[in-house]
Swiss-Prot record:
Keywords: Methylation, Ribonucleoprotein, Ribosomal protein, RNA-binding, rRNA-binding
PROSITE patterns noted in UniProt: RIBOSOMAL_L11
Its job: Forms part of the ribosomal stalk which helps the ribosome interact with GTP-bound translation factors.
Matches recorded under SMART domains: RL11 (SM00649)
Subunit structure: Part of the ribosomal stalk of the 50S ribosomal subunit. Interacts with L10 and the large rRNA to form the base of the stalk. L10 forms an elongated spine to which L12 dimers bind in a sequential fashion forming a multimeric L10(L12)X complex.
Name of the protein in its database record: Large ribosomal subunit protein uL11
Lineage: Bacteria, Bacillati, Actinomycetota, Actinomycetes, Micrococcales
Family: Belongs to the universal ribosomal protein uL11 family.
Native source organism of the sequence: Beutenbergia cavernae (strain ATCC BAA-8 / DSM 12333 / CCUG 43141 / JCM 11478 / NBRC 16432 / NCIMB 13614 / HKI 0122)
InterPro entries per the UniProt record, alphabetical: Ribosomal_uL11, Ribosomal_uL11_bac-typ, Ribosomal_uL11_C, Ribosomal_uL11_C_sf, Ribosomal_uL11_CS, Ribosomal_uL11_N, Ribosomal_uL11_N_sf
Record's signal peptide: none
Superkingdom: Bacteria
Keyword DNA-binding: no
GO MF annotation terms: large ribosomal subunit rRNA binding; structural constituent of ribosome
C-alpha cells in the first residue's frame, strides 16, 4: 500500500453546477492552497454537468504535493425548498410574512434527496429538519 499523502487544506465551497470558473470566489480560495484552478474547474464541471441549475456544495481536500480530491454534496435544503415553492428567496421576516407553502409530500421528497447529507437516522427525522428550515424561510408546511 502506498504511503498516505499529507493533507494541507480542506476547502468548502458552494458553486453553481457546471459553472465553475477561475474567477472569484473559486480562484482565490484554491490559489492560496496552490491548487491548479483550471484542472479543478474542468473536473467539477464534468462531475456536475447533469445537475445544471442547482448550487452544489463541494469539499476539496488539498494534499502537500498540491494534488486534490473533491466530494460533491447534495444541494442546500434552502435551495431545494425555494425551487419546490417557486420563490426567488425566503421571507425577510419569516414569522410574520409567509412567502409560500409546501405540502408534506414535497417536504418528504426534499428530505429523501438530502437524507445522505443530513444528521438524521430516518426519513421522519429528516422531514422535521427540512420543515424547520422551511419555517425559518417563511415557507409554511401544510398537510
Amino acid at each position: 500500500m502506498p504511503p498516505k499523502k499529507k493533507v494541507t487544506g480542506l476547502i468548502k465551497l458552494q458553486i453553481q453546477a457546471g459553472a465553475a470558473n477561475p474567477a472569484p470566489p473559486i480562484g482565490p480560495a484554491l490559489g492560496q492552497h496552490g491548487v491548479n484552478i483550471m484542472e479543478f474547474c474542468k473536473a467539477y464541471n464534468a462531475a456536475t454537468e447533469a445537475q445544471r441549475g442547482n448550487v452544489i456544495p463541494v469539499e476539496i481536500t488539498v494534499y502537500e504535493d498540491r494534488s486534490f480530491t473533491f466530494i460533491t454534496k447534495t444541494p442546500p435544503a434552502a435551495e431545494l425548498i425555494k425551487k419546490a415553492a417557486g420563490v426567488a428567496k425566503g421571507s425577510a421576516t419569516p414569522h410574520t410574512a409567509k412567502v409560500a407553502s409546501l405540502t408534506r409530500e414535497q417536504v418528504r421528497e426534499i428530505a429523501q434527496t438530502k437524507l445522505a447529507d443530513l444528521n438524521a437516522n430516518d426519513i421522519d427525522a429528516a422531514e422535521k429538519i427540512i420543515a424547520g428550515t422551511a419555517r425559518s424561510m417563511g415557507v409554511t408546511v401544510t398537510d
